[in-house]
């Protein structure tokens, strides 16, 4: 008896759900469609009328005479006369006043300095025998032991380089050789380049510049050494027999 009651309730619930789904499918969408009597803009016409009710004169959609969509006369889409797309008269299409070139997007300007800097950082510099140009660095804070040189450096640090030239670390036996070569080529290149622009360096400038570039070359050596050892460790890891066997097994599973 209980089972029959449960079965009856399940049947009633199923029929009710099925009826609700059918009603949802047949239920019309609110707002009305094209010429269904609705209005997309309430208060602009009587029910069942046009979507854009006339406001006197002209044909359907002609507020002040003229063709369709002509508020003040003119061709199609001409608010104040003129060719299509001419808000206030003028020449041909797209030549309406100050907006004459709106349909022609302006070409983006390429900042050649940024392109050159991005291409040069870490790349081999032509004409320097395999030297590379490092990334830009913040100029280090250095104390030179006397107030005059400290103040001179703070006032003139923008005149000193913020990038160094160097060769790969695997071409040097130790850090001192790398730094010595890095300082010489960087100071030389910066001095020659700046001198050609009409700016000369004093003995104080050269002394301070060598100290600044030395610190930057040490930083560059540490970066390059770390990257070099990481690359070497990766090669050793992936060249070991267990790793090769594991990779081969995974490839076999994927392909097979």
Swiss-Prot record:
Species of origin: Rupicapra rupicapra
Keywords in alphabetical order: Amyloid, Cell membrane, Copper, Disulfide bond, Glycoprotein, Golgi apparatus, GPI-anchor, Lipoprotein, Membrane, Metal-binding, Prion, Repeat, Signal, Zinc
Family, similarity comment: Belongs to the prion family.
Top-level taxon of origin: Eukaryota
Binding of Cu(2+) 4, residues: 88, 90-91
Source lineage: Eukaryota, Metazoa, Chordata, Craniata, Vertebrata
Compositionally biased spans, kind Gly residues: 55-97
UniProt binding sites for Cu(2+) 3: 80-82
Gene Ontology molecular function: copper ion binding
Protein name, as recorded: Major prion protein
């Amino acid at each position: 008896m209980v089972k029959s009651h449960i079965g009856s309730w399940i049947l009633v619930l199923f029929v009710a759900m099925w009826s609700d789904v059918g009603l949802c499918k047949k239920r019309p969408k609110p707002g009305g469609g094209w010429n269904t009597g609705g209005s997309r803009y309430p208060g602009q016409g009587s029910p069942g009328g046009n979507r854009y009710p006339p406001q006197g004169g002209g044909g359907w959609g002609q507020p002040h005479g003229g063709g369709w969509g002509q508020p003040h006369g003119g061709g199609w889409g001409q608010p104040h006369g003129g060719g299509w797309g001419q808000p206030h008269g003028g020449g041909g299409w797209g030549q309406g006043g100050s907006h004459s070139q709106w349909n022609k997007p302006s070409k983006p300007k390429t900042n050649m300095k940024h392109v050159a800097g991005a291409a040069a950082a870490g790349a081999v510099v032509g004409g320097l025998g395999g030297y590379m140009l490092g990334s830009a660095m913040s100029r280090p804070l250095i104390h030179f032991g006397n107030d005059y040189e400290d103040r001179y450096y703070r006032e003139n640090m923008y005149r000193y380089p913020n990038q160094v030239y160097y060769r790969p670390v695997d071409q040097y036996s130790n850090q001192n050789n790398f730094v010595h070569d890095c300082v010489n080529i960087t100071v030389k290149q910066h001095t020659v380049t700046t001198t050609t622009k009409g700016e000369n360096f004093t003995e104080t400038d050269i002394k301070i510049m060598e100290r600044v570039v030395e610190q930057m070359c040490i930083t560059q050596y540490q970066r390059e050494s770390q990257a070099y050892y990481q690359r070497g460790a990766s090669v050793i890891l992936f060249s070991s027999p267990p790793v090769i066997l594991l990779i081969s097994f995974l490839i076999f599973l994927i392909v097979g």
